[in-house]
Amino acid sequence: MNTSILSDRAYGLLVESTIEDIRALNIEDPVERWLVFVETIRLESQVYCSRKRNQEKQIKRRCEKGIELLEQNPRLNDSLELQVHYEYFKNKLNDWTRQQIEGHQVRIKTQPRFEHCEPDIDFYATLEKKTSKKRVISHLKGADGVTKYDTEGLSDIATDFYTELFSVKRSDEGTTLKLLQNVEKRVSQKHRASMDRIITREELRVVVAKLKRNKTPGPDGIPAEFYQYFWHLIEDFYFDFITEVEKGSLPEEKNSSITSLIYKNKGDIDLLAYYRPIALMNVDVKILTKLLSMRLVTVLPTIIHKSQTAVYGRTIADNIHVVRDIIDLVNRDDEEAALLFIDQEKAFDRVSHTFLYKVLRKFGFGDRFIHWIELVYSNATTRININGFFTKKIPLRCGVRQGCPLSALLYVMIIEILALQLRANPNIVGFTINNEKLVSSHYADDSVIKITQNRCFKEVYKELADYQRASGAKVNYDKTQGLWLGKWKNRKDDPFEELYESDSQKITWTSGNVKHLGIYVGNNDPITQTFKEIIPKMIRRLNFWKPLKLPTLAKSRVIEIFHASKLFYATNFYAIPPDLEKIVTAAFLDYINFPRKKAVMSRMEMEKLRGSGGAKLINIKLKAETPKVQWLMKLVTDENLGPHRYLFERLVSPQTGPLTACQSIFAETSYLKRCKIENSFYNEALLGISKLHTFKNYPDINDEPFFYNKIFVTSTDDEIHDKTLTPFKGNKVLSKIITYGDLLNAAGTVTQPKLMAVIRKKLESIEHIRENVESHRIFGLEDGKEYEFESVSQKQIYSELVFHQSRDHPSVGKWSIDNLGVVDWVKVWDALHNQFYTEKTKSSIWEQLHLNFYTTYNFNTWHNQLQPCPLCRKIPEDVFHIIHDCKFTKVVWKRAEKVLMKIYPRTPTIHELAFGLSDTRKEDRFAVVLRNWVTFTLRHFILLEEHKTYKRNENSEVKLTPSYEKFFANFNFKATQELKLKKRLYDFQGLKDKYKSIVTVGNALAHLADGEFVWNDLL
């Protein structure tokens, strides 16, 4: 189903009539009624989509024909009527192109989609073609070793492989009982009652609202957007259906799925063992499983050991930090140790259902919750998608489906049984950290076992064998890797050699590096190997994106989302080598400036926040430093990171002089530089956090690295005192405004029970901060006591605190003071980035300011009066002239004054023409948004004319007509389309009155006639 039809009024009426027709059938069985509804909607939607697609193709052909005829007409440049028709056809064709681009973007999962870029369908078509080509399975090798290339042969191989994979996995009862004896933590009575409660309509509404969009639907073809859009109509049908299902079972057609195969980018591409099967489930069943997962996610942290990190409140980074620090510590102290990186064959798909249900009961889950799990998995089937062709149905008699919201959470409990057994075995030593045994760490199916004695190898193999017999799992010994450390680095033997049950089982042992959770760890410079693998791929992707025409703001966002994510994931654990950092910086700037040969602005200017006139381009050094600083913050605030703190102390304390490693967190930069800490990760982290140890009269957010996003305040004091920040003296705590740097400094010096007093009323007066307060604990004080704190986001209080600063842009200079007075850039940008502005408007404003005003060569030539105005030939031309004093500009403003006054009754000023309205009453904000929209569009038109005339190098005055009429004919059409789109959005959100108040302000852009919106002509 094409989700664009959901906003069509005709389709909405079709859905309503379908529901009424089904109600008229008086089907008593809720399950049958739901099945009839889903099948009817599926067929009706297919017909509607086909009809709409044909209509759009006809419109496209008409527009192309119209454009062709008009371009051949010699009167086109002289006739305003022909120009309006020409613009109409072009805009219609652009709309069609954008729809096609959006389709490409959805299919290749390119998010976010940039509405303000020029339509470039060829770019996205090429990108989709490349993506689709990767998904095609050209050949497969069967169990008999014969390679097949035809569709029938591929389907037969897939059917045989997955029929065997999803067949019943025997669970040895005796071994299961032995493993389950180690389970000590059980679900509390409160949590058990919460898990077993009846499903309510309110809970279903929350679940439906949280469904992810732009996801491939299941076999019935109905996407999540359909449920979100029409939930108010279908809620009764679905609630009755799910209530009835609990009494019996899920219908087979509902509990079926399509399995899509995704190559893992490793291993033989012709073997299905190297493909990840993703189940595309029907959304009506996914609603149920998501509801159960939302209940389960809050319970798991109470029953799962902290060595597992695929649990709410824990992160994948916790595992990698432990592995990296253990390797560094063992190698430094030359101890005996080895790490075993376990690889399981199809870990999610081999879970025995019998074992799963026993594990749930052992952990103490109630009968109703387990019954729901059994319903979801009891009679499930799937069909494999091979290049668009589907195999016959395959029963799912084992496994937890990847693609189901429940699967990862259920698997966490399965692998916990292995972790418990490894810890319970007294002959598996591992590491002892803070009197706690650390034997293994797990993130979903990625497991690492720590071995420190030769006798442990045999015991580990035995426990893995027991786990396989009980759960149905299968360890891939030939893909499992072992890493020798310390004294064992030169070992060449395989300690498991005599234990293997077959010749095909053989662990690969190395003294080099091993890739773990996307990061190389090991003995041979894993830092360089990690970044040298990531950076070239990132640069190739950047070069591919260069042809797509995007504004600078959008390019900065593209870098952050699409290209730099893997790079900065690696910086969570390693410091980027300086030579590679230079390569990355050059690649980013090259992409930002393309196709310009000369940079628009300096890198430092680009890295500033938008609120300071920058593009928020990633500051590589700061961005790479930030996760390291945040890790140190977490070390001193998270009570679950005891082992990590111990390793940190062991690694760093010998190099920090009289201070312990944790105390060095509060040391000054000069002290840390003298320490010369060898570990590059912790050296960068400590130097980074030392930058926060500053005292100021006010917490200047711009002076602090903007990635450090927490400001702490105490939860006890209610008094406000605006005094200079002063260190603590005895029992007396002088009042302060506290940043995180102040907190760290104080925590390292004071020993009194009361830590600090803060400004509180100021923060509490900000409503949106009070609503977003989170609870935190701070640890590591000398007396060992805990203090409660609350934290708020720096972004939330930025707009309030920044008013304490005097922040005129240095480039504004004499022009703004002489002609406009001192410009308050905070208010200017606050107005420009109003919440009602679209991304297109924001980007357009930014481009105008930076490409035409105070940050480029153009401003210097204007300001220094080096060239005449190309529009009116008056000398000199400066920024003030081009915006207000130019003869051409005055005519434009005069033509627009009537519309501006109609929107908001205030005479246009120089300040407004340059920067828009800002200091207005709250109740006038809708009018201000509309008036600024028109003002910015006018200014954009003026600047476009100036650029075009300058390039043509004309020596005569430029006349307003017909360029003005043509431009605003185009603007009026686009404005109408954009407002109509926003109307559909507000209608969907139930905000019709809000929309009405926006578009009908002063009846300037639109007015109501007989209850319908009528769009005005702005000419």
Q: Residue ranges of each PLM-predicted region?
A:
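Conserved pre-catalytic core of RNA-dependent polymerases
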Residues: 190-417
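Extended C-terminal regions of large enzymes
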Residues: 584, 598-854, 858, 913, ...
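Catalytic palm active-site di-aspartate
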Residues: 41, 218, 256-259, 276, ...
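Surface polyanion/phosphate-binding segment centered on an Asp-His-Pro turn
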Residues: 1-58, 66, 154-156, 168, ...
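Non-catalytic, peripheral interaction segments enriched in hydrophobic/basic residues
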Residues: 116, 305-306, 312-313, 444-445, ...
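Short, charged alpha-helical motifs in flexible N/C-terminal segments and linkers
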Residues: 53-163, 197-242, 246-252, 259, ...
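Short, conserved micro-motifs composed of acidic
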Residues: 192-194, 375, 388-390, 460, ...
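Short Cys/His-based metal-binding microdomains
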Residues: 859-916
